[in-house]
């Protein structure tokens, strides 16, 4: 446990040192920064804010986790597998951000390119996971289900789905970073109960990095994590649930990401079926609350108010999950 705490503190320090340096690099290089294409007026002031901050906490977490796990004798196949997915999905996000920021390609990677790279990363993760005894048993609400060769399709769906879900959640200052901290906190408890001290190192390391990043990402944000951060974090959560053989728990622990994704899917489907009508003022659904509270027609909510609502939902859902598992 103390090794995991050291990993968290190390990544926290590396992040709070690295982020200011990264911001200065942005400013000196006169990089355009984040572009805003949303219809939320209060977001227009954020145009030009440095992005790709996820690069800092991601690299800090990967390096700190690897080195500390290595020297503490905890560099297991589980650790390398999680670090592997962090790197692969972070790389996909980095390419997407790089095209947007440095090449001025507004779309970045197109959806097909991004999906292809995510699927490739998922296949590599599956092969690595299976090679090290991962198995093909799916935990469905506490009941084991043998999937056989179909397990790879579940893994791909889980990794791609949740990486994109966290990406959708990263739409207002601080929302994704603390939401993921809460989710990782729940998985830290599960890992501790399973005596998976190797995974605790990676979990605590990322928590430390995100807490350090939040100091610069809360409203008003000085930097955004970008796709490099959000895609990697979503992939990590999915990979953790698989490595801990508690896949179903991510539906509750990650309820915020599920809610955000479902809102987009419902909005698009309803819009097409009704010829232009909407369920929400704007999706992902955190923008609906920004524009007009619960009803979408009331007084606009501040980002802090939306943040605390969603963090609260995530925290309660995580506590319920842990209660189901251990009480």
Swiss-Prot record:
It is a multi-pass membrane protein. It comes from the Bacteria. Disulfide bonds: none annotated. Pathway: Cell wall biogenesis; peptidoglycan biosynthesis. PROSITE patterns: MRAY_2. The keyword Repressor does not apply. The keyword Nucleotide-binding does not apply. GO terms for biological process: cell division; cell wall organization; peptidoglycan biosynthetic process; regulation of cell shape. GO terms for molecular function: metal ion binding; phospho-N-acetylmuramoyl-pentapeptide-transferase activity. Belongs to the glycosyltransferase 4 family. MraY subfamily. This is Phospho-N-acetylmuramoyl-pentapeptide-transferase. It comes from Streptococcus gordonii (strain Challis / ATCC 35105 / BCRC 15272 / CH1 / DL1 / V288).
């Amino acid at each position: 446990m103390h090794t995991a705490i050291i990993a968290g503190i190390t990544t926290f320090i590396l992040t709070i040192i690295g982020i200011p340096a990264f911001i200065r690099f942005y400013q000196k290089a006169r990089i355009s920064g984040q572009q805003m294409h949303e219809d939320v007026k209060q977001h227009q002031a954020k145009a030009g804010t440095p992005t790709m901050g996820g690069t800092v906490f991601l690299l800090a977490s990967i390096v700190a986790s690897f080195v500390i796990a290595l020297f503490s004798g905890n560099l297991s196949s589980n650790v390398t597998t999680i670090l592997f997915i962090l790197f692969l999905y972070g790389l996909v996000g980095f390419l997407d951000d790089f095209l947007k920021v440095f090449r001025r390609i507004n779309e970045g990677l197109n959806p097909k390119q991004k999906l292809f790279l995510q699927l490739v990363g998922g296949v590599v993760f599956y092969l690595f996971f299976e090679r090290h005894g991962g198995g093909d048993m799916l935990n469905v609400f506490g009941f084991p289900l043998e999937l056989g060769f179909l397990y790879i399709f579940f893994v791909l769906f889980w990794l791609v789905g949740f990486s994109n879900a966290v990406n959708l959640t990263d739409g207002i200052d601080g929302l994704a970073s603390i939401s993921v901290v809460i989710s990782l906190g729940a998985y830290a408890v599960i890992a501790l109960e399973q005596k998976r001290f190797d995974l605790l190192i990676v979990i605590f390391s990322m928590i430390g990095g995100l807490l350090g990043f939040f100091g610069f990402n809360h409203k008003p944000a000085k930097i955004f994590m970008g796709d490099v951060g959000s895609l990697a974090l979503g992939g990590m959560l999915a990979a953790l649930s698989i490595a801990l053989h508690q896949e179903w728990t991510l539906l509750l622990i990650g309820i915020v990401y599920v809610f955000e994704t479902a809102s987009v899917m419902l909005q698009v489907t309803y819009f097409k079926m009704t010829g232009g009508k909407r369920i929400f003022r704007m999706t992902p659904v955190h923008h609906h609350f920004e524009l007009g509270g619960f009803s979408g027609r009331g007084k606009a909510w501040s980002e802090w108010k939306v943040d605390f609502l969603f963090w609260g939902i995530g925290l309660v859902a995580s506590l319920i999950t842990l209660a189901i598992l251990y009480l």
